[in-house]
Structure formats: structure tokens, C-alpha cells
Amino acid sequence: TYHRAGGSPYSRLRRTVAGVAVGLAFRRYLSERNIPFDVKGAAPFTNPDRYDVSLGGRRCDIQSFLISHREQISEMKRNPQVILNAPALVPSDQNAAEGHSDRDIYLFAFLPGLVAASQEEMRKVVAANQPHYLVHVLPDSWMRPAAWNPLGALVVKSEAEEAITLELGGQDEGRETRLLEVEIPPRKRVEIPNEFFSLARIHSKAPPNARIGIRNMSENEAHMIGAFDWGNIWVYGMEIVLAGFLSREEFNRRATPVYEGARVFQYEKTRVKNLAVSVVDLKPVAELFERIKEHTL
């Protein structure tokens, strides 16, 4: 999930994007095979622990892992069994959170996918007309303000010589996602009415070639975004590996701790304490689907 994932905000967003992609692909996979499931409401970035798929009346919690190193991706293609020795990880705080049941299902998935994270890689992607999604992440004072009050009127200004379309993303009073698209004329400023209680990120369809400024008029707080202060959070993956599943009760019975800072297949260094079962000890996903069809789950 976003905040416990650690790393740069753009790395965290890429992992969140990968998780959303896995969830959507899983639902499509179920639909194509006429496997019945319920949708409980998509999990937003602001509360990614909220599950969205129920199988046989049981909560299905998908734990997805983005594998973005070329060497690992090549190894997974040459020898898919390499992931059998990887740990199936669940963050300890997530596992212990309220609202879980021992009947919950943990489903583990790997998404091998490249990222274009550096400025040079991003320029190559844009020049080649490949898919990309450019965002700038706002500081914590904008994303998670100390007091939950309206931000007030926002003023956005562009120093570019051509018009630019931006999408502002944040939260409203009820902490639901709020998106607003605004076009900024060349070297002009645009005032945005009071619509946000927090502002998390700004998305630009085209790479800005000049600075963009945003000011919170009520707090008189300004934030400048340089032409190189954007990250590409697109994940270039074509397939997803559904590694296996366990009930939460069985997972907790078998799991051993993996402490913060440990090196594992998925991460150079884990950011939080996890519980883990080896992937080789998971039950095959085919068994899960068969039990759903036979109503024996």
C-alpha cells in the first residue's frame, strides 16, 4: 500500500498502480472464466487496504508485488519457478488490522514490469510516443494537512509559452477522491474555487517545458514545480503471475516474521515488518477457482 511501501513518492505510486492493475486483471480473469465474484467497491489510493473482491462470500485480499529489475524479469521469463523460493509477504500491521476474518483469502500475485523512472528514460518514452502518465506529488503539508479544513481558493500559474492542461487530484471533506481538470493559458494564472481539503498530486498529459506554480490563498503557501519535477508512474507490464493462495487462518498458522530491512526477492530492503510463507507452500489458484465453482469454499 502507498504509505507503508516506502521509497520515493513516485516509486510508491508505481507500486500502487501495479496493485490496481493486478486487481482489475484478476476481475477480468474471473469474468472470462465465468467464476462468480462480488465487487465491494474499488479501493481508493487513500485507503488501499479496503478490499474490492469477494469470492464465495469471503474477502479476497490480493497481495501484489511489482518486479521492475530487468535481470529479475528476464529470470522469471526463463525460469518461472524462480518465484517458488520467494516469500509471500503480508505487512504485519495490515494483517493485524481490525475488520479481518480468519476466513479471508490472501491471494499472492507478481507483476513483472519495467518502469521509466529517470528523466532520461522519461524523455525517451515521450519521444517514442509510448504510453506515459506524468505526475508531480505535492509536499506533505498539501497532501496531509494538520487540520482537515478547506484549502480555500487555489491559484495556478504557468510560465509556458503554450496552454497546458492539468488534472489536480486530492480529497474532499469526506476524504473521497476529488479530481479537477483545468486549462492554464500561456503565462497566465487561473483561480480554482474551494473544492479540496487536501491536494496530493498534479497530472500533466504532456511534459511541461516551464515552471508551474500553485498557491493556497488562505494559507498564503506557494509551491513551484520545475520542468524536471515530474515522474512517470506508468508500469510497462504485459502479464501477471497468480502465485497461489491461503486462508488468513492458515497463513497466520504457517507464517514466520520477516523484519524491516531484510533483503527478499521482491525488495532490496523491506520497509516494514512482514509475515511470510514461502510461495512454494501456497495452494494453487486453480484449486481456489474449482472450490468456488463447486460451492465448497
Pin down the residues of each PLM region.
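Active-site beta-strand termini and strand-to-loop segments that position acidic
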Residues: 53-57
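Nucleic-acid endonuclease domains
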Residues: 1-50, 64-297
